[in-house]
């Protein structure tokens, strides 16, 4: 039994004639029941052979094979494409957990020439293929292949290939890529919003079922060339506009001190409950220092705020507005209006208490528990986020402090003893006779021995 992504209980013969590739029933018309020749199916155009790995050109603009999902495009240079263990497999209806295994394939897109004559290389785009399908259908899970990143669900058996049929673009659209809650998308990448292909028979069936009058009008429209949009046209136009303005498409916008200050002030002007902390306005500036009443946030998360790559995991636990009001205990408390010199105003606090319950079946449970344990009561740990480094002193203040330290370190001479003070005065006749007697006897009185050399 082969599975078809996007369809419930899909078998090897993936669908009957009245089911679209995305699993939605469509209206059966007369045109769907009649036999169609090659020309009718393609509305007068020549049959386009399905491109495979051997028939597609090497220009870099053709997507290898046909992935069931839209791609993930890189928009920042130097970023690495990777998922955490157990993450990275796109969600699709009808695919059991045992079949959720495969790899992401890097598609190197073509380069183009800017108006000033320079060659610009578009950043790569990644596509997902189930194990045993796609450009590396013969590879085993975990093989070291350039441009391949292996992913699998924790319940999948990676020793066997997936029982997934290949996608036929004429009958199945590419499914917009979605991941399980808690999945962390690689930094510098974004998910394409929808597939690039559409069934060729949809517009034909619609036009043939309108009646003879509209059929003539539609046949005249067939002579007009169909307008096609290349997958990379949007990127090319954006790059050309940026090149005309003298900017590099791959260069991130620089944040100056002035712009960061403006962003920070804009956030702080909002009510406290509407602030969103980020790099320019950290958590402690928005909500104050950590303590018993605000006990969440490690050092890294306090710096980055909601820009922290782990924050989307925590956002899965955040209650909705409805859950906040209807699932919490609320209490309205009136607070003091301030000092006597301030204008009188009524201040209230809407105090709330509640709980968010989850268990080990929640997708990404282990990662969520790890992030919670790292950030809950982190201020109590040694060297926690609440330890603030001292502000650097200004140059003038530092020099004054150094000069004061030098003055403090200078040793001041002690006052002379009474004997030392007496030696400096003139000797009286009595002193001279006493000194002569001492010299004759050869005895030096106590206290005068050390002072005789002064």
Curated annotation (Swiss-Prot):
Any one cellular-component term (Gene Ontology): host cell endoplasmic reticulum-Golgi intermediate compartment
Composition skew (Polar residues), residue ranges: 50-61, 215-227
Binding-site positions, RNA: 109, 125, 167
Compositional bias annotation for Low complexity: 10-23, 193-212
PTM: ADP-ribosylated. The ADP-ribosylation is retained in the virion during infection.
Region RNA-binding: start-end pairs: 56-197
UniProt region (Dimerization), positions on chain: 267-383
InterPro entries: N_prot_C_CoV, N_prot_N_CoV, NCAP_bCoV, Nucleocap_CoV, Nucleocapsid_C, Nucleocapsid_N
Residue ranges occupied by any CoV N NTD domain in the UniProt entry: 64-193
Entry superkingdom: Viruses
All copies of domain CoV N CTD, residue ranges: 260-383
Annotated compartments: Virion; Host endoplasmic reticulum-Golgi intermediate compartment; Host Golgi apparatus
Outcome following mutation: residue 12 to S: Almost no FGL2 transcription
Subunit structure: Homooligomer. Both monomeric and oligomeric forms interact with RNA. Interacts with protein M. Interacts with NSP3; this interaction serves to tether the genome to the newly translated replicase-transcriptase complex at a very early stage of infection.
Protein name as it appears in the record: Nucleoprotein
Species this chain originates from: Murine coronavirus (strain 3)
């Amino acid at each position: 039994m082969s599975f078809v992504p996007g369809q419930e209980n899909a078998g090897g013969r993936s669908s009957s004639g009245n089911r679209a590739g995305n699993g939605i029933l469509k209206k059966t018309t007369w045109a769907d029941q009649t036999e169609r020749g090659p020309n009718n199916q393609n509305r007068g155009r020549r049959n386009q052979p399905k491109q495979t790995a051997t028939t597609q050109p090497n220009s870099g603009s053709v997507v290898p094979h046909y992935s069931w999902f839209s791609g993930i495009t890189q928009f920042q240079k130097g970023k690495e494409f990777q998922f955490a263990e157990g993450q990275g497999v796109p969600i699709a209806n009808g695919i059991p957990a045992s079949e959720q295994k495969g790899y992401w394939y890097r598609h190197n897109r073509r380069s183009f020439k800017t108006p000033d004559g320079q060659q610009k290389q578009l950043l790569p785009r990644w596509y997902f293929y189930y194990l045993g399908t796609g450009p590396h259908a013969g590879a085993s899970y975990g093989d070291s292949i350039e441009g391949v990143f292996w992913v699998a669900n924790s319940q999948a058996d990676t020793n066997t290939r997936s029982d997934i049929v290949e996608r036929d673009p004429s009958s199945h659209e590419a499914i917009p890529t979605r991941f399980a809650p808690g999945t962390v998308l690689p930094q510098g990448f974004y998910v394409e919003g929808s597939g690039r292909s559409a069934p060729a028979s949809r517009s034909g069936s619609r036009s043939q079922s309108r009646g003879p009058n509209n059929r003539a009008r539609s046949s005249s429209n067939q002579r007009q060339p169909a307008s096609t949009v290349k997958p990379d046209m949007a990127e090319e136009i954006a790059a050309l506009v940026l090149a005309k303005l003298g900017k590099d498409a791959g260069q991130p916008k620089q944040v100056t001190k002035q712009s960061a200050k403006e962003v920070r002030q804009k956030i702080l002007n909002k009510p406290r409950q509407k602030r969103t902390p980020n790099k320019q306005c950290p958590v402690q500036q928005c909500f104050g220092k950590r303590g018993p009443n605000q006990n969440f946030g490690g050092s890294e998360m306090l710096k980055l705020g909601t820009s922290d790559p782990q924050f989307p995991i925590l956002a899965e636990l955040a209650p909705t507005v409805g859950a906040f009001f209807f699932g919490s205990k609320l209490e309205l408390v009136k607070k003091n209006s301030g000092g006597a010199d301030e204008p009188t105003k009524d201040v209230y606090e809407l105090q709330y208490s509640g709980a968010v319950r989850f268990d080990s079946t929640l997708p990404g449970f282990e990662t969520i528990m790890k992030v919670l344990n790292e950030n809950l009561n982190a201020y109590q740990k040694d060297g926690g986020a609440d330890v603030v480094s001292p502000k650097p002193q200004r140059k003038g203040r530092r020099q004054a402090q150094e000069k004061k330290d030098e003055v403090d370190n200078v040793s001041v001479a002690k006052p002379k003893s009474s004997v030392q003070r007496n030696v400096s005065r003139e000797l009286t006749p009595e002193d001279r006779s006493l000194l002569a007697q001492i010299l004759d006897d050869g005895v030096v009185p106590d206290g005068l021995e050390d002072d005789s050399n002064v």
